[in-house]
Structure formats: C-alpha cells, structure tokens
Amino acid sequence: MSLISAVPLASSCVSKSLISSVREHTALRRAIATLQMSRRGKSVAASIRMSSATAGSDDGVKRRIGDYHSNLWDDNFIQSLSSPYGASSYGEHADRLIGEVKEIFNSFSIADGELISPVNDLLQQLWMVDNVERLGIDRHFQTEIKVALDYVYRYWSEEGIGCGRDSAFTDLNTTALAFRIFRLHGYTVSSDVFEHFKDQKGQFAASANDTELQTRSVFNLFRASLIAFPEEKVLEEAEKFAAAYLKAALQTLPVSGLSREIQYVFDYRWHSNLPRLEARSYIDILADNTISGTPDANTKKLLELAKLEFNIFHSVQQKELQCLWRWWKEWGCPELTFIRHRYVEFYTLVSGIDMVPEHATFRLSCVKTCHLITILDDMYDTFGTIDELRLFTAAVKRWDPSATECLPEYMKGVYMVLYETVNEMAKEAQKSQRRDTLGYVRQALEDYIGSYLKEAQWIATGYVPTFQEYFENGKLSSGHRIATLQPILTLSIPFPHHILQEIDFPSKFNDYAASILRLRGDTRCYKADSARGEEASCISCYMKDNPGSTQEDALNHINGMIEDMIKKLNWEFLRPDNNAPISSKKHAFNISRGLHHFYNYRDGYSVASKETKDLVIKTVLEPVLM
C-alpha cells in the first residue's frame, strides 16, 4: 500500500474538522522559538523501505555526498499544529465582510453614467484595486475590479491620467499606478506615456521639495518599471531613476508604512515576489496605521477581511502540511540521507503563490513534484554512480514496477515513489482535463532525467561543455518544466492543446522561465557545486569560452542575460495578442516566481537560511493577530 491510498492527493484529506484545541498566538511563537531543528525516529514506506542501510552508504562504492543539513522541522511539531480558523463561523464572518467590501467598491457608484465625485474618483478606484490585490483578497472581487478598471480606462490617454475624471492635468502617481494595474490585467497601455513626465532635458527628475506624495509617485513608478517588456527604454530609465531616488529617500524617511513598502519591493521584486508574503507584509503595515491619505474606514474594513482570510487559509495550510508529512514519512523519504529534506520549504513557496483553499490538489501536487525533483537531482548529481544512473534512466523509460528488479536497493524505493506519485497525479489531472495526460507528463519526465544523465556523464568524465551546450541542457535539468506541467494539469482550469502549447515546452514562455531558473540558480550555487565536484556551471562554461575572463565577468554577463529574459518572460505572460489568456498562464508564471524566490539572494533551498525559516514562520506557521 502506498501513501496515495492512505492519504489521498485531493483536498479530502484537508477537509476534516480541525483539532479542537486552540494554540494561542503567544504560545505558538514560543513553540517556534524553541523548535528542535532535528529529525526524530525512522520511517518505513508501506511498500518499499528506503533506509540508510540500503542507500549505499556502506556498500563499498565510492560516492559523492552533498552534505546537506537535515530537515529543520520536528515531526511532533508539525503534527501538533492546529488552528481554530477552520470553523464555519469564521467563514461566515468572512462572507459578511466580503459583502461589505463590495459595498465599498459600489460606493463609488455611478449616477447618470458618471461617478459622484469627479475630484479623485479614478485614484480611489485604483487604490481599492491595488489594496485588495496586495492584501491577497482580490479573488473575491473580480467583477468589481473589472467594473472599476473599465471605468478608469475610459479616461486613459497618451499623456496618462489624473486623480479624477475632471482633473486638468495628469499626474505621475495615478498614471504609474494605473499603468501597472492595467498591464497586469491585460489592458493595452504604452510605456511611452512616461515620456510626458520627463524634464526638458529628457530625463526623469524630482522637485527640490521632497514630499510623501512625490516619494509615493516615484515608488509607483518603480513598481511599474518592474513589469517592463523588451526594448522599453523609458521603463529602463524609470527603474534607474526611481531606484536611486528611493534608496536616497530611505536614508531620510522615518520608519513608516511608506518606507516599509519601499523596502519590501526592493527586497522582493515582482518576478520573485510571493503574494502571501506580500499580503503578510502589507497587513502588518496597514495594522500599524502609518499610511496617510487613505480612507480610514475603508482601510479598517479591508484590513479586517485580509486578516481573517489570512488566518482561514492558515488553517488550511496546517492540514495540508500534515498530509504532506504523512506522504513523506510513509514513503520513507527521511531515510534517504543523501537528499535535501525540504517539503516544508517547498510547501511554503507553493502556498505562497496560491491561496485559494479549493486548490489543495494543485498545491499538494506541486510540492510532491518538487520533492521528487529534489530526490532525483541529489541522486544524479552526487550519490548515484554513472552505471546505476543509466539503469535508473532506462527503468523510467519502461515505466513498469518490474523495472526495479535491475536497480540497486536504494533506487527501488526512489523509483516506486516516483512511479506511484506521478501516476496518481495523472489520475487527478484526468479528472480535471477529461483526457489522459500521463503520456505527456512521462515524456517531460524522460527529457528531464535524460538531461540529468548527461550532466552526470560530464561529472564522471570531468568534461566542461561550452556555455551554449550547458545552457541548453540546463534549461531541462532546471526542473522548471516538470515542476510546472504536472501540477497545473490538476487545476479545474481547462488546458486544451493550443493553450498548453503557449505554456509548456517548447514555448517561449517555458524557455524563458526555465532559462532564468537555471541561470539564477547557478549564480547562487556554483561555488558549492564546484566543491562537490560539479565543475560544469554557467559561470565555468562562460569562462572556458572566454579565456582570460574572471568570475565577476561571467556573473555580470549572466545577470545581464537574466534581466533581459525577465522582460521577455513578462511579455510572454502579459502579451495581449497571445492565444492563452493571462488566467491560464498565471499559475505557471507564479510557480516560476516561487522557484526564483528561493534564489533571491542565495541558495535558500539547499541551505535553509534565516530568511527561509522566517518565511515559513510568517506565512505558514504563524497567524496574524486579529
């Protein structure tokens, strides 16, 4: 019996009533602070035991070991997690608040075809849209958002937009805020609009008198610049100007809501931002009541709903995390001592990009897929011998449990958890897509493992490929395609072939997302990889192709490639002429954001840094104070 039958993949395992006991907020913080960072006990898979004894550690074979730290999250602690917010009364309260926030949207009501207030009606509508999105509650207000944006878009011009429909002049704050929101929602807007906010010398400039409004205007300009498309020079100029201005402003601004907003966007740019982390940060900012110029009553109502929604989903997260723990333990994953045990960190990222309670199947599929990728990565990169890896690659192509007969003992367990989990996810995908997708996923898996085998052969022979050879193979071995494909197929969103072609390999969307992940990952991991005997990386291959170049030269070149590809990925995601709507691409794009988040400053995955642990605590383990 596998975990698949013991703990269903679908959301049924998280729909049971929550444990009745309530952990108070302060008690939870104490528990987190004293959390033992060690693994306890051993686990036996119901079908095949994967133990350190059978993992080849004492089989006389010379093996490379990644030397990764153990799982940071104590089993007993994970199983003790509980929350009161799964009770139906909280859901009913949230429904009432949702109705009240809809009334706020409607309070900008239309009379005789026009909004009642002509002074700042446009900015008010944009403020509401921006706030519900940053607070992570926008899914409840899609109709209201569409009505608001359609109205504001009527007043959009080549020179931008003002605060209200009767404004005599356009202003940078409203224009930048509108530009960003319009682009993210698929409206056609040109970045040339920002040319009208340059001085006579053709440069962005700020007035001598710094004000909070001016700083916020530049802040929104910076946010708009982060969703630039290729060749949008004016947004490149805007980003440089805004970044310099805001960095200087942080030196003089008091600690306030605005300064914290600025720091957050500097820390987590759009392509690596997690919506749930942003929601937690913005909830904290609004709770401190430090943002001036916002409608106080409306802010309080939004904040009350955002806190409640955050905590309701927090209860969902705890049950899903416990489901994943059982899967991880049942298959004996803790006994694979050569791999990175990061199911908690992976779940944190996945639940950070999708906060819809009904999407449990998607989240669990995504985490399981990422954990399988990690097992394969560590097996091919370090632990497995080249002969063993060839056998495993051939067994995956056969896709039959009998293929384990020719495998070493430690590989048998790896093969079976891969086989059973992928097949079970394919069954879930068939329910959603109403067609068999297993063959499609198997081909992606074979391509992925084939790229791993090629890299293992390079390691075994000491071969350092050309940059282009390494890069093309690295896009496959990054794991982006397989981490994205299987989970999105479990969503209730239909993915017919013509839409899947725009997202999956060999689409430009997939190519750019995988490229960024490979390049960014290498810039963060190349030193540790080299220490383990993995000489091929984008840095070493670039230096081989360019004799006399330094590591700094290679990093500068690669970082430039990443910046260019981020703009290209923005275009593929948001382009208005694409066959696949933004809604269909959103989950694939957000998986990309989540994976990139791991490499924001360092390899926060192989070595779970303080930032990674803080992320887990803030977005999964700790509720917000109501």
Swiss-Prot record:
Pathway field: Terpene metabolism; oleoresin biosynthesis; Secondary metabolite biosynthesis; terpenoid biosynthesis
Cofactor binding note: Binds 3 Mg(2+) or Mn(2+) ions per subunit.
Keyword annotations: Chloroplast, Lyase, Magnesium, Metal-binding, Plastid, Transit peptide
Subcellular localization, as worded in the UniProt entry: Plastid, Chloroplast
Annotated EC: 4.2.3.107, 4.2.3.113
Protein name as annotated: (+)-3-carene synthase 1, chloroplastic
GO BP annotations, alphabetical order: diterpenoid biosynthetic process; green leaf volatile biosynthetic process; terpenoid biosynthetic process
Entry keyword Plastid: yes
Catalytic reaction(s) noted: (2E)-geranyl diphosphate = (+)-car-3-ene + diphosphate; (2E)-geranyl diphosphate = terpinolene + diphosphate
UniProt xrefs under InterPro entries: Isoprenoid_synthase_dom_sf, Terpene_cyclase-like_1_C, Terpene_cyclase_plant_C1, Terpene_synth_N, Terpene_synth_N_sf, Terpene_synthase-like, Terpene_synthase_metal-bd, Terpenoid_cyclase/PrenylTrfase
Family recorded in the similarity comment: Belongs to the terpene synthase family. Tpsd subfamily.
Taxonomic source organism: Pinus contorta
GO terms, molecular function: magnesium ion binding; terpene synthase activity
Cofactors named for this entry: Mg(2+); Mn(2+)
Leader sequence segment: none
GO cellular component, as recorded: chloroplast
